[in-house]
Amino acid sequence: MATRHRRRGGSAPSWAKPGKPGERPGGPKKSRGRTSWKSLLIWGVFGVTLGLMAGYYLWGELITDDSVTEVLAAQRDAVAQRFFHVPCSQDYESLKQFEACTPRKCGRAVTDSVITLQEAEKMRRLAEAGLSLGGSDGGASILDLHSGALSMGKKFVNMYRFFGDKLKDVMSDEDFNLYREVRLKIQHEIARTFNISVSSLHLTKPTFFSRMNSSEAKTAHDEYWHPHIDKVTYGSFDYTSLLYLSDYSQDFGGGRFVFIDEGANRTVEPRTGRLSFFTSGSENLHRVEKVSWGTRYAITISFTCNPEHAIGDPTWT
């Protein structure tokens, strides 16, 4: 159900009143009447035009500022599966050579029935353990088990090089096996939903855990709230998935995922074990709200149709 909020007010523009028209020397009185009628008509058309322009501007402001919001999946709801179709953009023209993987339809999906609560809780513990070794000075920290990238202060380190064998005190082969099993489940669900070949879909980079809180941003990497298109920001993405590892309104405030559509913003409220996935093109412009309190955990798992952009599952070697 759409929730509509009051528009931000603003004083109407103040217009100067026209002065009293002067009389033309020797002109007949009816001429002055015709001039007055035309003047009123011109000012009327001008006023209507300005009104339409102002209305258009205010409507644009309304949408941009999240004033019209539809909740696609609330945290309190257990969602078996919901799919929301959106027209495909032109961003997939280069994928025609990968026919078995090219989107036959575009959209976004939400499900709470693919990843179990137990699996999600184990994934969160893995994220917490890895991020406990570092963490950003700002509000957003990442942990990439594939490349080893770990936020530390205002920079990133390669945790495999930085910590070496000490990492095995924090992570295990069992953790990596769980990671692979979760990834496979998500890959199969994306393929089933979009009616594409699961074998034509490849894990790609970056794929990473994220931890967000209300700390002030210290670098551009901490500014996670800007609207973006995944296929533009990360060129290899064709399908994006997010697995949420904490609960909106219980573990944190703010931090909802927002699809920015013409006419409304549509949100997904994170819930532990909730899987949200979508085609990565410009039909799915989106952003994440700033976290206002608490800590938000999630993992982004991305897929490509191009085998040249594929990466393997994380391993110790």
From Swiss-Prot:
Where in this protein does the record put region Disordered? Answer: 1-34
Q: Where found, per UniProt? A: Membrane
> What cofactors does the UniProt entry give for this protein?
Fe(2+); L-ascorbate
Q: What's a Pfam family in this record?
A: 2OG-FeII_Oxy_3
- Kindly list every residue the record annotates as glycosylated: 195, 213, 265
* Residue ranges annotated as Cytoplasmic topological domain: 1-39
Q: What is this protein called?
A: 2-oxoglutarate and iron-dependent oxygenase domain-containing protein 3
